[in-house]
Amino acid sequence: MVPSVHIIGCGLIGTSIALSLRKSGYKVSAEDINADHVAQARDLGVLATLSEPQFGETSGQRAEVVFICVPPGVAAETINVAFGKFDGALILDVSSVRRSIIDELDRELTDSGRVMGAHPMAGREVSGPSSARADLFQDRIWVLTQGSEASRVTAAMVITDMGGALVTMEPADHDRAVALVSHVPQLVSSALAAQLIDAAQSDLAISGSGLGDTIRIAGSDPNLWSDILQGNATEISRVLRQVSNELAELSTALEDKNRVRIEQTLRAGNEGRARIPGKHGSGTNRFESVNVMISDQPGALAELFAGVGVLDINLEDVRIEHVMGRPSGIVQLFVPIGESEELESGLYQRGFDTRGRQ
């Protein structure tokens, strides 16, 4: 029998959890202090209520699992109150920082075994319940910290029912890891995007997918991310100093026309990128791609995907780049090595405007 679930915080993550678990047959309720968030969550079919001054009072049920989906700056306070309001419930905090929150919790909570960190390594560059998706956590890692063995079993069941994969870490190890793989990338993306504010429009007009890929996450919520970054300041500062030193040395190498040092950085980047796990946890995936020009109109992309489906070739990834000044776009279809020629030939024979392989 699945446990009843209550969610405190109806933002992107909280509402996505509600949608996912409801789809899996869970009884789910939610609350938020933001009336707009409550209304948007309700529009999506979530049983959401406006929080009273002491949140938890309006839940209308005795939840067995409570997700804390609030900004890190108020997570500890929310956990402390929820711990008393939902007697015996497993409390899962989705915050992307751990140590700073643990330090603020009452000792009774940290010793109880029923308060856990459950950080989903998933999200979007847009926020709010209107951006929520039931499949947001499909095949995404959730990092579990703390908790008793019984709590871990329950957490694992709920998370796997959302399609998630589990990794267990100590809180300090979690904070060190996310500083490198999540928090600093956000800052680097934002810092680069900030350079575009005073750029000439004619310069921006020639930008391509490289810039777009690099600054995609710069569209994230500044208020939420300020909370996150302050909560993991020590680890983030350490990584930022390393990146800053690398950039300073690279700048000097460029001024000195030191080709060896420049190549050293580029090759180190290749090596680091290759260490990122690929599909199913294997080494970095290497794909071939086929470029296809399609018109910018309803149904064009669906028609292309249908054409690929007829060929019985598995797409590993898709990227779309709009063509400036034309109502069309280039779709880059990524497939396993050795299958791009068959894909290009098959699509061409079916009348698609193929534009070469890579």
Residue ranges, per PLM feature:
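NAD(P)+-binding Rossmann beta1-loop-alpha1 motif at the extreme N-terminus of oxidoreductases
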Residues: 1-53, 57-60, 65
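Hydrophobic anchor at the start of a short beta-strand
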Residues: 5, 28, 166, 315, ...
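Helix N-cap at the beta1-alpha1 junction of Rossmann-like dinucleotide-binding domains, i.e.
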Residues: 35-36, 96, 149
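Rossmann-like NAD(P)-binding element
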Residues: 54-92
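Rossmann-like NAD(P)(H) cofactor-binding subdomain of soluble oxidoreductases
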Residues: 78-130
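Internal alpha-helical scaffold of NAD(P)-dependent oxidoreductase catalytic cores
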Residues: 136-219
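Interdomain hinge/lid region at the active-site interface
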Residues: 200-270, 289-290, 297
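A conserved regulatory-domain signal marking ACT and ACT-like small-molecule sensing domains
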Residues: 272-358
